[in-house]
From Swiss-Prot:
Recorded consequence of changing R279K: In acd2-6; spontaneous spreading cell death lesions
Name assigned to this protein: Red chlorophyll catabolite reductase, chloroplastic
Species of the source: Arabidopsis thaliana
Subunit note: Homodimer. Interacts with HCAR. Interacts with SGR1, NYC1, NOL, PPH, PAO and the LHCII complex. Part of a SGR1-CCE-LHCII complex, which acts in chlorophyll breakdown.
Plastid as UniProt keyword: yes
């Protein structure tokens, strides 16, 4: 794409009838070529980001929620995030028969930032039973310079009238051994109020993951909920009036109380830093093994799955 752009630029700016100009190299050529290549790369990157932000297989209400959350993360943390550098065939990919498609957007944090990386994704897969599985998720992972929790929101849907919601600030310290951590991030922020409010709706019930690992990884205040509505419009109403405000408030807590570097959150001791790194990598590695390593080959085939999972492992620092 860059070469086509450059060739077009030079052919249109050098008329053939001006022989002195065509026989003499332009003094701007060395500058124009990298600029053209850079512009082309920027255009391609923008196209792939727009593709991710389409969230094309979900309802307008759900799409708006995901766009709002991702835009808030990128706008508020813009100075701390590096551009997404995933290969194009990892940022958007599908399986050979076209029954599954996914988009991936990962931005690493700057070296001076407490952010390790932010990841957003959507997955669409037609299941042999005739239904479609649609998963949309956004997560923020912090590095070992801070002990503050991470952020996750995920919506899993295989029916137009029901879905599973996971919304949490997953803890990175043992809550029994560190009661001050529990108080600071979960009690003082009233994080459990969102789960309690959602559970007051007759359509909402607790969701119990079949994975013991998943259940152990989330905080006691996690909103792990199953929403069953009689009508599609009712599900949209719950998403718009209840889930969306809760997700935005939890994200705000993460941005204000976890990402901002304050003295009490900075990890000082080398032993504590190493322990956080071990825990973070163990969590990421186990998540990939139990989820992507098992499910992606079924959805996308071995070749595509291998390429994408390798890129994710590299971004997660667990290669």
């Amino acid at each position: 794409m860059a070469m086509i752009f450059c060739n077009t630029l030079y052919s249109s700016s050098s008329p053939s009838y001006l022989s002195p100009l065509t026989s003499k190299p332009s003094r701007f050529s060395k500058n124009l070529r990298p600029r053209a290549q850079f512009q082309s790369m920027e255009d391609h990157d923008d196209h792939l980001r727009r593709k991710f932000m389409e969230f094309p297989y979900v309802s307008p209400t759900r799409k708006q929620l995901m766009v709002d959350l991702m835009s808030t993360v990128e706008n508020r943390l813009q100075s701390q995030l590096l551009p997404c550098n995933l290969p194009p065939d990892v940022r958007n990919f599908n399986n050979p028969n076209g029954s599954a498609e996914a988009s991936l957007h990962i931005r690493s944090g700057d070296k001076s930032s407490p952010i390790d990386f932010v990841i957003g994704s959507w997955i669409h897969c037609k299941i042999p039973t005739g239904v479609s599985l649609n998963i949309t998720s956004i997560s923020g992972f912090l590095n070992s310079s801070t002990k503050a929790p991470n952020f996750v929101v995920e919506l899993i849907q295989s029916s137009s009238k029901s879905l599973v919601l996971i919304l949490d600030l997953p803890h990175r310290k043992d809550l029994v051994l560190n009661p001050d951590y529990l108080k600071e991030y979960y009690q003082d922020t009233a994080l459990d109020s969102h789960r309690q409010s959602l559970l007051k709706l007759p359509e909402v019930n607790p969701y119990v993951s079949p994975s013991l690992f998943v259940r152990s990884a989330f905080s006691p205040t996690a909103s792990m909920l199953k929403i069953d509505a009689e009508e599609e419009d009712k599900l949209e109403e719950i998403l718009r009036d209840h889930v969306s405000p809760a997700a935005k408030e939890v994200l705000e807590v993460w941005l204000e109380r976890c990402v901002k570097e304050e003295e009490e959150k900075i990890v000082v001791g080398e032993e504590e830093r190493m322990e956080l790194e071990r825990r973070d990598k163990s969590f990421r590695r186990k998540s990939i093994e139990d989820d992507l390593d098992l499910q992606f080959p079924r959805m996308f085939g071995e070749e595509v799955s291998s390429r994408v999972v390798h890129a994710i492992k590299e971004a997660f620092g667990v290669l």
